[in-house]
């Protein structure tokens, strides 16, 4: 008996060591083990931090619309039936009803186009001090035609005599660029159950769109607003070769 004890003890020690090794292997596969690989690293990618799990958004895409006046002229004859022209006339009418030049300006010839068009000294100054100033006087005069209750007047439409539209070549009327011109269009409106109208003295083209360049008069003898040919009914448009 005494000679077998070392072998017996050795067997017990070996058994205990084997159990300990088995426990260690099982422990490595338990959730939360320090040795456990994350799903991300098992896929060959770095695990994402909590912050990176939020949805990222790209900067909003912005679009810019170029000022048509900054672009070169074309020889396209404008149409009076386009949404752009109708929007211009709605702006013009809103300016007349409210006696507001800023409200009406979208219908007026663009400043950048005017600078390209005019072959004169300081076209910017002429645009502001003469063209827009006269336009403002005429908007105010048309507002007065609507009487004490201008808000009761509603725009019906604008009659453009396309048959009278003509090309004005470069070098005419101190202009360095050619354009189409049409005179004596009629702005038609209804007020108190009656149809009325007044004229738009001159519109000229830029890149295939009509713009007002003279509302009440092409030429004037006084610094006062002018209303062109106010009439009951739709009125009529006379041909003109003005530039």
Model-predicted regions and their roles:
Residues 2, 18-20, 234-235:
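Extracellular/periplasmic juxtamembrane helices and adjacent flexible linkers that interface
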Residues 122-196, 243:
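Surface-exposed, charged secondary-structure patches
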Residues 169-243:
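Low-complexity, intrinsically disordered terminal/linker segments enriched in charged
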Residues 20-42:
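C-terminal region of N-terminal signal peptides and the immediate post-cleavage residues
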Residues 2-14:
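N-terminal Sec-pathway targeting helices
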Residues 12-22:
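Core hydrophobic alpha-helical transmembrane segments of single-pass membrane proteins
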Residues 43-98, 106, 114-119:
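Short, low-complexity N-terminal intrinsically disordered segments enriched in polar/charged residues
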Residues 93-101, 106-114, 140, 144-147, ...:
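Sec-exported extracytoplasmic/periplasmic mature domains
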